[in-house]
């Protein structure tokens, strides 16, 4: 529903009844700066909710969660606010991992980095918060997934209107008794206090002044900030108003927070009034549902309880009659299932890093809680099945008004959850067994030493890295057994692992990321590159190492800001254009200053930053330049970008429509396409995909591009990238009958320009994510020609025709295998011959008369060493023990231990024995009690290792008497 914007001064304020309230839900950690946790006030400590608490009769009645959400949005739409959709849980903000508040999508507007598109807006925003995960299910109000209802003003209305409307919404729309509402205000915000008391009519005794830690919002050390005011609901007004503590969770719940952004905090800490005053509010939908539905906690609202009921039925327990511990586990399941469904729907795939780790941790927590309450298999009799999909079905059925796109992604969501659950169950039992052993060992060790039982960081890392146990789950289980965990030691182990792979994840930021004043003062760049590869432009700014300068001379690297440009700036996976800027010096371009452009990036929304080197002359701010894009490279990017669209359509056609894009790279000479899929794409499927793409190329279809409303594009079936930020008007690129995508990139005008398409590789890059690399256009021709040359040379070397290469290679490989087998057999015979001379040198150890051979056999390989040991153990009479070592070359060490049955009965085991010796040689190994092999990388240590082996076996045999 769209409502025309009305100025704040023209809006009539509704009559206000006397009584109290106002504040935003503390769904962020206490006092947050865009998700950065600040020190918590003592009053925010969560109280544990008794599982048997009853505050009212459950049931949504008139006030279903959907009705509460709808009423909020319609209330503000009627007051001039534009209803905007929830943004993705994957934010377009590198400073936060997940969307944690309703204001996050408007952060650039609040910080003055982007112009406002509407004067005021209202949203219901999906949010994820995991910092208080240990309180989920144990208190009445903590959740990982929640919806934040919000109304926002971007310089339109301010404190008076925001306060009046919040009160009207709470008391008139939702019908909350005014006498049950309390207000908190910033201690120095007399204006807000006066509005609440004198205009709204809240009694002074129900307005509490709070300190800056609780009621003053900041965006960082400097920048926009302001006081906030919060509305609380009082569950027990009969307790009176004297000495009432709004931090008492058993009595009060904060459900609405109003942030008044009216100051700019300067470097010296002083506050100056903002020219544009903003409003940022947030109401917790689940909290309001708890109040209106008269249930004892957020979990028993109609937003979550259907999931709990489903889990209870699968566990064959009654929620109403079960014990408190089971209720807590059911609440955790209900909460976490909402989080994982919406995260997976927004394209977050379980993994061991970043957002993927968040969803994996939540999934595995649900699986563990399900097992604790008795759910086995799929919960419907199939012990080999998964139960998460059944719970996810309930979440999806509740999602219609939260996120309409979830239903269309049902198949991929259910498939991903099933795979992740079964994957975890496969390792869970092994991991649980090891964890039990580690916990038993910790308790036993502590008992012997008188210390408190604890698991080391190495133990935690082993469970995490090998068995997939999130450290938080290990800590939970350990806590249940009274065992502490060494989180600091675990962090050290994790850091060591990160250092090994850090290079692969480094991100290089442009120096303009410092957001210098020059960038902020320059208007958006006009992009001309869809229609032209050259244009005249004016230099609006120059940056060297991020600092503004007026002139740059030959040899310097520079970042150039133009008023308009034909250069495409990197976005949507497509790399930025290359080319040249010529400082206008008349008709003779040879006399002009020349800047070679090797990259173009966007800054602060839509300012194009041209990165390059001054090759000749100098350039000054204000000068006119001729901007010329490298046409050949641009054509390569266009061919690969259109080919990427065709590839995505072919993938969906061949392997299933549930595949979705997870990322892409469109370069001048190649393309890379990452997609969500649970298995490798077969050779046959890859061939079919190639054929489809090349067929569409040969159809010579003309592409169509148009700009339309975002919702119209979605209704037409246009594919949108998960997490991508789109405006109200979007550019749609269509290959008729084949592909329809939202895309701002450059494309060929006709598919025939692509010339051809070839897949180079297909591989997995993370759990549930596959990658295809391919070439198109001139790169395709180059690739085919290179492969043809390779084939010619191969045919010449093998002296066969191309069609006979495969057969000839197989013959050569078979001959090679036979030759290697012959060589190995000969080496084994030689080793046995050497061993024959060793049998007579065996040492006899009393009192068991054990025959022992410990010998260095030179360069004998591992197979020969094994044959020699088998020969000796068969030749020597039982009891006998043989330990052989060798250095076969390439810095390798081979070790073998063979013990006869009588020696094994003495308690000596070859597997354990050889592993310990191998460590001296920089390796390891093991095997059975009677026979084991090992290896190493330090041949220089072999003599000492064998001497130690001799001493230990003699000692072991001697002591066995």
Curated annotation (Swiss-Prot):
A GO CC annotation recorded here is: cytosol
InterPro entries named in the record? aa-tRNA-synth_II/BPL/LPL, Ala-tRNA-lgiase_IIc, Ala-tRNA-ligase_IIc_anticod-bd, Ala-tRNA-synth_IIc_core, Ala-tRNA-synth_IIc_N, Ala-tRNA_ligase, Ala_tRNA_ligase_euk/bac, Ala_tRNA_synth_plant
> Which GO biological process entries does UniProt record here?
alanyl-tRNA aminoacylation
The answer to whether keyword Aminoacyl-tRNA synthetase applies is: yes
Q: Which cofactor does it need?
A: Zn(2+)
Keyword set, alphabetical order: Aminoacyl-tRNA synthetase, ATP-binding, Chloroplast, Ligase, Metal-binding, Mitochondrion, Nucleotide-binding, Plastid, Protein biosynthesis, RNA-binding, Transit peptide, tRNA-binding, Zinc
Residues at which Zn(2+) binds: 641, 645, 743, 747
Q: How does it assemble?
A: Monomer.
Q: What task does this protein carry out?
A: Catalyzes the attachment of alanine to tRNA(Ala) in a two-step reaction: alanine is first activated by ATP to form Ala-AMP and then transferred to the acceptor end of tRNA(Ala). Also edits incorrectly charged tRNA(Ala) via its editing domain.
Matches recorded under NCBIfam families: alaS
Q: What is this protein called?
A: Alanine--tRNA ligase, chloroplastic/mitochondrial
Q: Which organism is it from?
A: Sorghum bicolor (Sorghum)
């Amino acid at each position: 529903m769209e409502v025309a914007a009305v100025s704040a001064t023209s809006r009539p304020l509704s009559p206000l009844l006397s009584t109290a309230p106002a504040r935003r839900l503390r769904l962020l950690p206490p006092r947050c700066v865009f998700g950065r946790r600040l020190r918590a006030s003592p009053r925010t400590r969560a109280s544990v909710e008794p599982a048997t608490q009853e505050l009212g009769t459950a049931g949504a009645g008139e006030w279903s969660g959907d009705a509460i959400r709808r009423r909020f949005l319609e209330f503000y739409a009627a007051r001039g606010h534009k209803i905007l959709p929830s943004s993705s849980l994957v934010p377009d903000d590198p400073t936060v991992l997940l969307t944690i508040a309703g204001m996050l999508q408007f952060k650039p507007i609040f910080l003055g980095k982007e112009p406002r598109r509407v004067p005021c807006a209202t949203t219901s925003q999906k949010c994820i918060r995991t910092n208080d995960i240990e309180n989920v299910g144990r208190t009445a109000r903590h959740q990982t997934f929640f919806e934040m209802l919000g109304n926002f003003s971007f310089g339109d209305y301010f404190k008076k209107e925001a306060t009046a409307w919040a009160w009207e919404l709470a008391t008139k729309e939702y019908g909350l008794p005014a006498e049950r509402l309390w207000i908190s205000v910033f201690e120095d915000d007399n204006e807000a206090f006066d509005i609440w008391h004198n205009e709204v009519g809240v009694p002074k005794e129900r307005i509490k002044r709070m300190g800056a830690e609780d009621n003053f919002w900041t965006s960082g050390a400097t920048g926009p900030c302001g006081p906030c005011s919060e509305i609380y609901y009082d569950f027990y007004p009969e307790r009176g108003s004297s000495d009432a503590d709004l931090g008492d969770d058993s009595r009060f719940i904060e459900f609405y927070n109003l942030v008044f952004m009216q100051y700019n905090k300067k470097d010296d800490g002083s506050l100056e009034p903002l020219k544009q005053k903003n409003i940022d509010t947030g109401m917790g939908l689940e909290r309001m549902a708890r109040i209106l539905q008269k249930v004892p906690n957020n979990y028993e609202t109609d937003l979550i309880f259907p999931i709990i009921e489903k889990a209870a039925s699968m566990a064959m327990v009654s929620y109403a009659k079960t014990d408190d511990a089971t209720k807590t586990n059911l609440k955790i399941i209900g909460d976490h299932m909402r989080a994982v469904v919406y995260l997976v729907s927004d394209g977050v795939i379980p993994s061991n890093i970043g957002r993927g780790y968040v969803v994996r941790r939540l999934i595995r927590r649900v699986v563990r809680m399900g097992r604790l309450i008795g759910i086995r298999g799929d919960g419907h009799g199939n012990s080999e099945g998964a139960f998460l999909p059944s719970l996810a079905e309930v979440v999806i059925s509740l999602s219609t008004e939260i996120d309409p796109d979830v239903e269309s992604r049902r198949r991929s969501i259910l498939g991903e959850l099933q795979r992740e659950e079964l994957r975890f169950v496969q390792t869970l039992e092994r991991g649980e067994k090891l964890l039990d052993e580690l916990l038993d060992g910790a308790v036993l060790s502590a008992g012997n030493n008188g210390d408190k039982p604890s698991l080391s960081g190495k133990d935690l890392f082993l469970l995490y890295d090998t068995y997939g146990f999130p450290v938080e789950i290990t800590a939970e289980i350990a806590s249940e057994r009274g065992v502490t965990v060494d989180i600091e030691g675990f962090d050290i182990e994790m850091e060591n692992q990160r250092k090994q792979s850090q290079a692969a994840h480094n991100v290089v930021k442009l120096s303009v990321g410092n957001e210098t004043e020059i960038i902020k003062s320059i208007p958006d760049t006009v992009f001309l590159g869809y229609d032209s590869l050259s244009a005249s432009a004016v230099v609006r700014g120059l940056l060297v190492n991020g600092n503004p300068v007026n002139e740059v001379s030959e040899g310097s690297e520079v970042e150039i800001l133009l008023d308009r440009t034909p250069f495409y700036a990197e976005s949507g996976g497509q790399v930025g254009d290359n080319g040249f800027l010529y400082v206008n010096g008349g008709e003779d371009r040879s006399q002009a200053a020349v800047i070679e452009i090797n990259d173009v990036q966007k800054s602060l929304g839509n300012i194009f930053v041209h990165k390059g080197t001054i090759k000749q002359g100098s350039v000054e701010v204000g000068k006119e330049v001729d901007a010329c894009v490298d046409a050949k490279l641009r054509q390569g990017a266009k061919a690969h970008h259109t080919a990427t669209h065709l590839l995505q359509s072919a993938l969906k056609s061949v392997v299933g429509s549930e595949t979705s894009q997870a990322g892409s790279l469109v370069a001048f000479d190649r393309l890379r396409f990452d997609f969500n899929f649970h298995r490798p794409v077969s050779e046959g499927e890859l061939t079919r995909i190639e054929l489809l793409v090349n067929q569409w190329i040969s159809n010579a279809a003309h592409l169509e591009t148009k700009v339309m409303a975002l919702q119209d594009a979605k209704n037409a079936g246009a594919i949108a990238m998960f997490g991508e930020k789109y405006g109200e008007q979007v550019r749609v690129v269509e290959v008729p009958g084949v592909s329809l995508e939202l895309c701002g990139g450059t494309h060929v005008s006709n598919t025939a320009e692509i010339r051809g398409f070839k897949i180079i590789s297909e591989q997995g890059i993370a759990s549930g994510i596959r990658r295809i690399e391919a070439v198109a256009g001139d790169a395709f021709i180059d690739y085919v020609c290179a492969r043809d040359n390779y084939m010619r040379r191969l045919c010449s070397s093998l002296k066969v025709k191309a069609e006979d290469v495969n057969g000839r290679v197989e013959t050569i490989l078979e001959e090679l295998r036979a030759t290697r087998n012959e060589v190995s057999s000969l080496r084994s015979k030689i080793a046995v011959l050497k061993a024959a001379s060793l049998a007579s040198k065996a040492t006899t150890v009393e009192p068991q008369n054990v025959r022992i051979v410990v010998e260095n056999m030179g360069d004998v390989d591992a197979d020969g060493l094994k044959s020699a040991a088998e020969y000796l153990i068969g030749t020597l009479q039982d009891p006998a023990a043989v330990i052989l070592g060798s250095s076969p070359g390439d810095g390798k060490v081979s070790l073998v231990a063979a013990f006869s049955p009588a020696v094994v009965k003495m308690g000596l085991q070859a597997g354990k024995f050889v592993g310990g010796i191998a460590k001296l040689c920089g390796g390891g190994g093991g095997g059975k009690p009677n026979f084991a092999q090992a290896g190493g990388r330090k041949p220089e240590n072999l003599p000492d290792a064998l001497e130690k082996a001799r001493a230990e076996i003699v000692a072991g045999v001697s002591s066995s008497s």
